[in-house]
């Protein structure tokens, strides 16, 4: 996959993007043939035990990005710039974006709208592709006052559209639309020449992204309306561990076939 191929998919073929935070997951996604692997700062919620993406550091992102690249050597990987790794300084923002590219990303994702255009253009000038992200932006959780759908009021719709157009003009190759009304997502998708990728943004985006853990049911108690659980992996893994525990306790594991004998194989 390349940026050029992603751009050509608009209005032709739906783009599939899924998160990964480690090598085994990345291997599964590459085998499945997803179009884009996202190393999201959502690793904070899904892997590191944080209650939001805000505590995630650049160093943590790099460690997980490296693991994903090792697991999916041939995939197109986008990595998030985490909170406080960009925005306060153009130079630091571009440097940190470059570190993600150096460590295995094909592109970086930056949350926010027109306010990031100077950073985006500086990144593009030195060869760093950028994916935009508007709507509900998790790093701004405290500003939103919680996980709230965006774009319900006319003023909010206008702001979303203005930011989408500004990002396209800045040179991003695609935009994630998160937790916005289906109507504004449809309008944005129709007015942009670059692909939109939705998460909780309805049926009319050019692609869809979901968190791996939500797809496979690793946290079955978390059931956001916009997501879908395709398997209950939590129960499968729990049953496996319980069986192992039981066999150790009743001394049926290890069995003869699991041990080494003198003169044997």
UniProtKB/Swiss-Prot annotation:
Pathway connected to this protein: Cofactor biosynthesis; (R)-pantothenate biosynthesis; (R)-pantoate from 3-methyl-2-oxobutanoate: step 1/2
Localization terms from the record: Cytoplasm
Annotated positions binding 3-methyl-2-oxobutanoate: 41-42, 80, 109
What class does this enzyme belong to in the EC scheme? transferase
> One matching Pfam family, short form?
Pantoate_transf
Q: Which Gene3D superfamilies did the record assign? A: Phosphoenolpyruvate-binding domains
**Subunit structure comment from the entry:** Homodecamer; pentamer of dimers.
Q: Which named protein is this?
A: 3-methyl-2-oxobutanoate hydroxymethyltransferase
Q: Give the organism's phylogenetic lineage.
A: Bacteria, Thermotogati, Thermotogota, Thermotogae, Thermotogales
